[in-house]
Curated annotation (Swiss-Prot):
The keyword Ubl conjugation does not apply. Residues 220-990 form the TBDR beta-barrel domain. GO terms for cellular component: cell outer membrane. Belongs to the TonB-dependent receptor family. It comes from Formosa agariphila (strain DSM 15362 / KCTC 12365 / LMG 23005 / KMM 3901 / M-2Alg 35-1). A motif (TonB C-terminal box) lies at residues 974-990. This is TonB-dependent receptor P26. InterPro entries: CarboxyPept-like_regulatory, Plug_dom, Plug_dom_sf, TonB-dep_OMP_SusC/RagA, TonB-dep_OMP_SusC/RagA_CS, TonB-dep_rcpt-like, TonB-dep_rcpt_b-brl, TonB_rcpt_b-brl_sf. Its main location: membrane. It is found in: Cell outer membrane. Keywords: Cell outer membrane, Membrane, Receptor, TonB box, Transmembrane, Transmembrane beta strand, Transport.
Length: 990
């Protein structure tokens, strides 16, 4: 029998490929035996088999394929991606089968990124990944989103995740407008210690890995050309409801009468202007986008090249962004063992920063005239009695624009001495240059009134840096039961930034604008320059071990050295350990049909945050003047104390998760629980006044984050003509301050007008919390005031506040916790349906249980007559309406308006984020020769919003204000509205 089989054996050869590219290392095994081989660097294999044998072809991330040998001597196989747990995901410095992951990684596909038109990729992540909160704080063209991965770990430092684009660490200051979203192949978000420890001191806030598209069509000389063209119309969303012109006049007159001031509007309302500032300053605005890419490959070269043009006008007039982006990705196989290539991205951006704010539309009285009687622009506010910055004049006369050039590249070389070893070195330069030109005309009416002349400034920022990564990877199977992958590497990065700014005042001739700053008053001009830089050296390693494909272990360690710290604290080690148990591979699970995959995993580790400016360990010298012998002298003095003991903020994280694939892959669910504790928080601590300073930055305090995440992906219906899939993302995060360096609380100021007391860091509370006094409505009678025991002035109809400490005075000492901007629940829910050539999807996202601090309440609800009022103020307290709880006009002149509970509103909301209808043209039936596929689509974005918030959109926020962006979360003063958008587009491939 044996001799017969040998005589009829034959040599089979061929190549194994996937998605147009050869697959080195693919397994080729004779089914039912242990006999097999693997493909070489070119994807080529040879094996001896009989005609009756079945060859099984397999590769990580792709579905197995079986082929009967028969009479064939050459069998070429193309594998298809396996979209179950065996899909390949990108991790730090490599890839891994999803089924082998021991850490928490969320994947966002290119389809999810491009389902609705966005100018920045971060805008496309909202609601797409459990545990990742994305807040679109502004609808301005090109505006950044705020991203929190499993909560914020720092109080004063950055809480933004680390962005890594094609292996290039770009940091939190990188402008994501530089990247074309249509170039993106996939996005992975690393969330737990096991995943992020490989990035050490910069991984504590999570890591976002962006992988761009590469060449396809290996072995084919014919390139593939794709084009994606769309146009959008943005519409102004629902706006806050304000008093009518006549109602506003009545309110302003009441306020003046109560204060004993002159009545500003003594005549009939019809004799005064009735300007709709929303209509004057906001309006529909278009978006134009064109993407063209070419991709292909020859025997040894694969390439992807694209060009993108994007132009978005803003719904707030004079705002907008125009972008040109070029990308080229090239891979060259020099030999069986040597490969090289590059990833290059260049962008040019012209951003119009806007000459008027949305706040102008909310705040300006409808009675404020635009023009004087002689036709010139009005520049004086009669109600306030001071010069007024006329927004219509600003749009016509002034300039505020930013130009940016960015080059981001990565050049690599791979050497594979054998199938088990890969040695890689990359060099990644990053150059960014921006220039902001600002000009305010001398003819601006408020400046004409003051006689100050115009002003202009030119600000240039040049950032240059490089990153060198060197890794060596070894992977091997030891016997039938053991599989290991080991990675070691070293990373070096250097970044420097130079800023030069010139400001000129007293410009009398507008002809040259900001192009001739010498045309000004030299005694008032300001010249500034600044330089900063840092270097990081890192050494890291990772070991992945699998036993019988059931038990998985991952060990990670990284040592970072940073120039921002002193010599004694320059280096820190970040370790992690993770393990996973594939329960579904156990013998007792083999006879059940529910679970295809069932995995329990856990991880624990340490990551860091070097959340300080490069020179904060050192003292700061500032310019100071003194008088010697009657002559003023200028010198330098110490303006900030040094602290050589500053070190890294460190976060220790625990993650436990259960993953399950059920019912033949039709249901995939994942449940995570995590706990994070951050120590050595960087805070300004009060120090003895004998030092000459009030405070010093120190490592004190700690906080914790804990929460859960749940994701569910289901295939509800799957037939030849109809498919229906659903995705649900739920997550909840709670944080708490554990220690503030020995004090119970720290008061902070988020808004200068509100003064202190509107936010406070409190041990045992979240970061941040809103604080203020309790608003109790209005005083209904003098008897009620007299019985209250309050010693400070009160007035019938005025605002009534709770005296928390009972001292008879309403002050910040009466402040209590009023709420938190952190939601109890973050959710996203998507349904995708396809019938024959039609695709339809809709996507909801939102939050529940968060509060918003409405900064507009002070001016538009309480008693300042020079500002417009919310429509509900028409029902305010008056002698004829004595039961109202809305304060009377002018009452603030007696009681003041401290930060109070009326400012805090429910921020829970549901947003219909995206609706998309697409038709995939049957190009073959339509006789469209040369066209591979064509899709026409219609998309709606931000179509509906359910919210009780007065300013309509609760996502608007003051992140970044006063340099305390983490604390300003949830503070909303009516930021730039998120528009409703309708998009019509065509995607075609030749």
């Amino acid at each position: 029998m044996f001799c017969y089989s040998s005589l009829h054996a034959q040599i089979i050869s061929g190549t194994v490929s996937a998605e147009g590219q050869v697959l080195p290392g693919a397994a080729v095994i004779i089914k039912g035996s242990t006999k097999g081989t693997s493909t070489d660097f070119d994807g080529y294999y040879t094996i001896e088999a009989q005609a009756s044998d079945v060859l099984v072809f397999s590769y990580v991330g792709y579905a197995n394929k079986e082929v009967t040998v028969g009479t064939n001597t050459q069998i070429d196989v193309a594998l298809e991606a396996d979209n179950t747990l065996d899909e390949v995901v990108v991790i730090g410095y490599g890839t891994q089968r999803k089924s082998d992951l021991t850490g928490s990684v969320s994947s966002v596909s290119a389809e999810d990124v491009n389902v609705n038109p966005v100018s920045r990729v971060d805008q496309a992540l909202q609601g797409r990944a459990a545990g990742v909160q994305v807040t679109q704080t502004s609808g301005a063209p090109g505006a950044a989103s705020v991203i929190r991965v499993r909560g914020g770990n720092s109080i004063t430092g950055s809480n933004e995740p680390l962005w890594v684009i094609d292996g290039i660490v770009v940091g939190t200051n990188f402008n994501l407008n530089n990247i074309n979203s249509n170039d993106i192949k996939s996005i992975e978000i690393l969330k737990d210690a096991s995943s992020i420890a490989i990035y050490g001191s910069r991984g504590a806030n999570g890591v976002v890995l962006v992988t761009t598209k590469t060449g396809t069509g290996a072995g084919s000389s014919k390139p593939e050309v794709s084009a994606n063209i769309y146009t959008s119309m943005q519409m102004v969303p629902e706006l806050p409801k304000m008093l009518s012109q006549a109602e506003q006049i009545a309110y302003t007159n009441e306020s003046a009468a109560f204060r004993g001031a002159a009545i500003p509007f003594p005549n009939d309302p019809s004799t005064y202007p009735n300007n709709d500032w929303f209509d004057l300053l906001l309006g529909p605005a278009p978006i134009y986008n064109a993407d063209v890419s070419i991709t292909g490959a020859s025997e040894n070269v694969s390439y992807y090249t694209s060009l993108n043009y994007f132009n978005q006008e803003g719904i707030v007039k004079t705002s907008g962004i125009e972008k040109y982006i070029f990308r080229s990705n090239l891979d060259i196989r020099l030999s069986d063992k040597l490969k090289t290539g590059f990833r290059v991205n260049y962008s040019y951006i012209d951003q119009q920063n806007g000459l008027v704010g949305y706040g102008n539309a909310i705040a300006t009285l409808p009675t404020q005239p635009i023009y004087n009687e002689d036709g010139s622009y009005n520049g004086f506010d009669e109600v306030v009695g001071s010069p007024w910055s006329n927004p219509i004049a600003n749009m016509a006369l002034n300039t505020n624009e930013t130009f940016r050039n960015n080059f981001l590249g990565s050049f690599y070389i791979d050497y594979s001495p054998s199938e088990k070893w890969i040695i890689r070195s990359t060099f990644s330069p990053d150059f960014d240059n921006s220039k902001q030109n600002r000009f305010t005309s001398s003819q601006s009416p408020n400046l004409l009134y003051l006689g100050e002349g115009g002003n202009a400034s030119v600000r240039t920022v040049n950032t240059k840096g490089w990153n060198n990564e060197n890794t060596i990877q070894y992977q091997s199977e030891i016997g039938e039961n053991h599989r290991i992958t080991a990675l070691g590497g070293a990373s070096f990065q250097k970044v420097s930034t130079e800023i030069v700014e010139s400001e000129a005042f007293g410009i009398t001739n507008d002809a040259t604008g900001f192009n001739n700053l010498s045309n000004s008053d030299p005694t008032r001009n300001i010249l500034t320059s600044d330089y900063s830089g840092f270097q990081i050296a890192s050494f890291f390693g990772r070991l992945n071990y699998a036993y019988k494909d059931k038990y998985l272990l991952t060990l990670v360690g990284r040592t970072d050295g940073s120039s921002v710290f002193s010599d004694d604290n320059k280096y820190e080690f970040y370790p992690s350990i993770a393990a996973a148990w594939k329960i579904s591979e156990e013998g007792f699970m083999q006879n059940q049909e529910t679970f295809g995959e069932l995995k329990l995993r856990a991880s624990y580790g340490k990551s860091g945050n070097q959340a300080i400016d490069p020179y904060r360990t050192k003292g700061l010298l500032v310019e100071a003047n003194t008088t010697l012998n009657g002559i003023q002298q200028t010198g330098l003095t110490l303006g900030r104390p040094s602290n050589p003991n500053l070190t890294w903020e460190t976060t220790n994280s625990l993650d436990i998760a259960l993953e399950a694939s059920m019912f033949n892959g039709r249901v995939f669910a994942e449940l995570n629980y995590y706990y994070k504790k951050t120590n050595d928080l960087l805070l300004d601590v009060t120090i003895p006044k004998q030092t000459g300073f009030n405070s010093q930055l120190q490592n004190v305090g700690s906080l914790e984050n804990k929460g859960w995440e749940f994701s569910l992906n289901t295939t509800n219906v799957r037939t030849d003509n109809f498919n229906w899939k659903s995705t649900l993302m739920l997550s909840s995060n709670k944080n708490k301050i554990l220690d503030l360096g020995g004090v119970d609380f720290i008061d902070l100021v988020v808004d200068e007008l509100l003064g202190s007391g509107n936010t406070r860091l409190i041990v045992g509370e979240s970061v941040p919390v809103f604080t203020g006094v309790k608003f109790l409505g209005t005083w209904k009678s003098q008897e009620e005031i007299d019985a209250s025991g309050l010693r400070d002035p009160q007035v019938v109809g005025g605002a009534k506040y709770h005296d928390e400490n009972g001292d008879g005075i309403i002050s910040t000492d009466d402040a209590v916790v009023l709420g938190s901007p952190l939601p109890d629940l973050i959710f996203g829910f998507e349904n995708t349906l396809s019938y024959k050539n039609l695709d339809f999807s809709f996507y909801f996202q939102g939050t529940q249980g968060n509060e918003v601090y409405n900064l507009r309440m002070r001016n538009h609800y309480f008693n300042r007559g020079e500002f417009t009022k919310f429509a509900e103020v028409a029902d305010r307290w008056t002698p004829e309406n004595p039961t109202s709880d809305i304060p009377r006009a002018g009452g603030d002149s007696v009681t003041g308006t401290p930060p109070n509970s009326a400012y805090v509103e429910d921020g829970s909301h549901i947003r219909l984020k995206t609706v998309r209808l697409a038709y995939n043209m049957p190009v073959d039936k339509m006789g469209m020769d040369g066209v591979k596929n064509a899709t026409v689509y219609l998309t709606g974005t931000n179509l509906l919003l359910w919210s009780d918030f007065r300013l309509i959109d609760p996502e608007g926020s003051n992140f970044g204000r006063n340099g305390i962006g983490n604390i300003a979360q949830g503070y909303n003063d009516g930021s730039y509205p998120n528009p409703r958008t309708i998009t019509l587009g065509l995607n075609v491939t030749f």
